[in-house]
Amino acid sequence: MFDRAAMLFLYTETPLHAGSGTSLGIVDLPIQRERTTGYPMIQASGLKGCLRDAVDSDPQKVEIVFGPDTQRASDHAGALSVGDARVLLFPVRSLAGVFAWVTSQNVLARFKREAEMAGLQVNWEPIGPAPTDDGTAFVANGSGVVANGRVVLEEFAFTAQPENAVKDIAEWLK
């Protein structure tokens, strides 16, 4: 169905709020979240719309890539198919250093699988097995967020467990 695949990496420097429309709750526009995990995300349709708006090009080329405008949407589909944007790393305040990038083993495993499907050469293995308790955080050897064998993120303290794979993943992402 597709000739090519690529992965788009988004890095936000300011707070991002991709609202999910309306809600019956106290929050007017709750953030978009994955149904299965509850993780924050940006739905593909909103991402594709933003990309289309950002393109300042020949209208005919825009129509070929993104499809016709709303009034003629049934004419044909665009050539570009966009997936949901998902969180890979999340900045969290750290006692040692300003902040730490955090993620989970599940997020990393899914990212690796999707990156390989997009044709990227992923030369690191997922971190595992999972810690036996919730009070452990995997860190790279020599990590700047470790103080006295502990990692303090927001108000939560974890025992630092050095893991070579963390450094491998960080190097690959650079």
Language-model segments: residues:
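RNA-binding basic/glycine-rich loop and surface signature characteristic of RAMP-family CRISPR effectors
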Residues: 1-174
